[in-house]
Amino acid sequence: MVGKRNLPVISRNFDLSPGVLRFSASRLRLKKGEKKPKFTKDTSAKLPKLQRNGTKFALGHSKTVTLRKTLTPGTVLIVLAGRHKGKRVVFLKQLPQSGLLLVTGPHKINGFPLRRIGQAFVIATSLKVNVSGVKIPEHINDEYFKRKSTAQKTGKNIFASGKTEYTVSEQRKKDIKTVDAPILAAIKKHPEHKFLFGYLGTRFSLGKNQYPHKMQF
C-alpha cells in the first residue's frame, strides 16, 4: 500500500497585518444549526388517576381515599389550617363521596361548627370521646355542605348590587344542636370532664423550646 502523503496543514486564518487576523475567534468557532429532530408522541404513558370517591372521572378510575389508622370516631383532632386553626375538634365519621372528615367542636365549647375537613390538615391525638350515642342525620353529606352560588347571569353591573354575605340557615343551626347534644352529654359523664371542657376550649400553640416532631399528642 502506498502511504498517505504528509500534506502541509494550511490554516484559513492568517495575518492581514501584524496583530490583525483575517477571522476572529468566534468566526472560526461558528457552528451551523442542526436539523430539528422529529417529535414522536409517547403512547405508552398511562393517564394519572384521581384519588376521589364516587363517580368515575375522565382521566381515570376513581380511588377510595384510605383513612389513617389513628383516625377513629371520637378521636380529638387538632386543626392545622383555616380560620379555626389550632382548635381541638371531635371526629365523627368519614364522608363516603369525598373522603373528607366530618368534625364538630362542639360549637358550644369552642365555636367550631359542624363541617368537613381533609385529613391532611389535622393531627390525631390520643384523647377520645364516646360518640356511640351520636346519630348523624342522613341528609348531612357532601351535598349538604356545598354552598349555593347566588350570582345570576344578568347584563347588569355586578358591582352595583354589592357583596352578599353568607348567613347560616336555621336548618344548619338545628343540625348542629342535634349532633352536639349527645357529645356534650358524653363529655359531662367523663371522669375528667372539667379537663375535657378546658382542653377542647383552648387552642393548640407551641411555646419556646417546644418542637412538634418531639411531642406525643
UniProtKB/Swiss-Prot annotation:
PROSITE patterns: RIBOSOMAL_L6E. InterPro entries: 60S_ribosomal_eL6 (IPR000915), Rib_uL2_dom2 (IPR014722), Ribosomal_eL6_CS (IPR049633), Ribosomal_eL6_KOW (IPR041997), Translation_prot_SH3-like_sf (IPR008991). Keywords: Cytoplasm, Endoplasmic reticulum, Ribonucleoprotein, Ribosomal protein. The keyword Amino-acid biosynthesis does not apply. It is found in: Cytoplasm, Cytosol; Cytoplasm; Rough endoplasmic reticulum. GO terms for molecular function: RNA binding; structural constituent of ribosome. One of its GO terms (biological process) is determination of adult lifespan. The keyword Plastid does not apply. GO terms for cellular component: cytosolic large ribosomal subunit; rough endoplasmic reticulum. Gene3D superfamilies: 2.30.30.30. Belongs to the eukaryotic ribosomal protein eL6 family. Component of the large ribosomal subunit. May bind IPO9 with low affinity. Component of the large ribosomal subunit. This is Large ribosomal subunit protein eL6. The gene is rpl-6.
